[in-house]
Amino acid sequence: MITIDGNGAVASVAFRTSEVIAIYPITPSSTMAEQADAWAGNGLKNVWGDVPRVVEMQSEAGAIGAVHGALQTGALSTSFTSSQGLLLMIPTLYKLAGQLMPFVLHVAARTVATHALSIFGDHSDVMAVRQTGCAMLCASSVQEAQDFALISHIATLQSRVPFIHFFDGFRTSHEINKIAPLADDTLLSLLPQDKIDEHRQRALNPEHPVIRGTSANPDTY
């Protein structure tokens, strides 16, 4: 057993199962991005023995755009966000779902600011992305947050449907509790390597070029 908060539990799984992590901090998800950046800076490796590349973009829109590019080149990618940050990602979430990109976005759910800023928790952010085509999985404890993070990374590879894994901001993201940690060998044994290989084979490559993102008329769209 280890003592950890929800953000730390999720970040650990996401970091160890990813190759490219695009970030832009926003409360209360910031510590997931901060920990991933610190781990990469310290040379911590993922389950395949590589140090994930963590890149901070200019906004959440840039972060999800970087994720999209990484996925198109066959990398395993993830990101973290909350509130208005999630809303900035909506256009690209539609693209990721439509292009069947395996990807997990970890969301510490938080109130969307309207007449005033609020950093407190509700589901107004995640409820705004229900129509994007992404699957959604909600965790309600620190243990669930860790376990569902892994389940999301497995399920998105199996289904080629992007997953939004969310949990309550502060109430779960900052809750400190004892959990049973997931070891590297457990992660590696549960991740579907055949689906990872298929994802890499679909990568854009100048050796066998393809066209993606074309314009379509109503008869075929």
Predicted regions and their residues:
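Short basic, glycine-rich beta-strand/loop surfaces that mediate nucleic-acid
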Residues: 98, 152, 179-181
